[in-house]
Amino acid sequence: LGLAIGLGLTLLAAIAYRDNPEECGLRPDGIQSTSTQDSQAGVTGVSLQRARQTPAFWIFIAAMFMSGMVGTALPFHIVDIHVQAGLDRSSAIAMFLPTAMIAVIVHFIGGWASDRTSLRPHLVLYLLGMIVTNVGIVYLDQSWGRPAIIVGYGIQGGMARLLSSVTWPRYYGRRHLGAIRSYAVAFGVAASALGPTIFGLSVDWFGSYNVAAWGCVTILIFLLPLTAFAREPHLSGQSSQ
C-alpha cells in the first residue's frame, strides 16, 4: 500500500505539479498575465540570510515553535491529561471533531481577512489561542476547561496553517521561498519532537502537566507585546507582487 501510494503520488506530481504560477502564465492571485516574460520578472524576494536579519522573522518563528510544541504535546498526552482531570478516554477523543471544525472556520475567515489586513492581528489571535489552550489544560477539571481547550486549540490550528502559508511569501517574497520556509519548518519539526517530551517530563518530575502548561503560557505572554515589531519589512530587492 505504501509503495502504491508513493509511486502514485510521485506520478501525479510529475504530471500536475508546477513550481510557480508563472509557469502557467498566471499570477499568484489568479489573474491572467499578459506576458510570460513580465510574469517571470515579477518573482521577487530576499535571501534567507537577509530574512533572518529582521525581527519579524524570529517573532513568527518563535510563535510557530510554540505552536509546534503545544500542537503535538496535547494530542500525544490528551487521554492522560483528561484522566488526571477525572475525565474518561471518550471525552478526550471527542474533542478533536469540534476542534477541527473551529480550525476550518478560523482558517477560512482568517484567509479572507489576511488579504485585507496586516498579519499582526492574526499573530495575536494565534498566540491567544495557544494561551487559552494551555490555561484550559490546567483547569480541565473545571466546567469551562474543556471548552477552553477546544476553542483555543481550534484557533491555534486554523491560524497555524494560515500563517505558515501566507507569512513568508508576503514578508520576504517568493524567489527564495523554499529556503526560507524550509528553515521555518525545521524549527517546527524540532518543536514537535520537544513538546511531548517537555509535557511528559512535567508529569514525571512534578506529577502533573500544569508546570509545562504554565511555562508555555509565560512564554506566550512574553511574545504578545513583541507582535508590535512583526511588521512587514519591505526589504530592498523585493517589490510588491
Residue ranges, per PLM feature:
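A membrane-interface helix-boundary motif in multi-pass transporters
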Residues: 1-3, 200-219
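C-terminal membrane-cytosol helix-exit motif in multi-pass small-molecule transporters
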Residues: 3-37, 223-231
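Small-residue (Gly/Pro/Ala) motifs that create kinks and tight helix-helix packing interfaces
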Residues: 9-13, 79, 194-203
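Extracytoplasmic gate region of multi-pass secondary transporters
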Residues: 49-110, 195
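C-terminal transmembrane helical hairpin of 12-TM major facilitator-type secondary transporters
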Residues: 71, 91, 97-167
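Interfacial helix-cap and linker-helix signal at transmembrane-aqueous boundaries
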Residues: 82-83, 113-114, 198-207
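Loop-to-transmembrane helix entry/capping segments in MFS-fold secondary transporters
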Residues: 89-90, 174-184
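Paired intracellular helix-loop junctions of major facilitator superfamily
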Residues: 168-178, 207
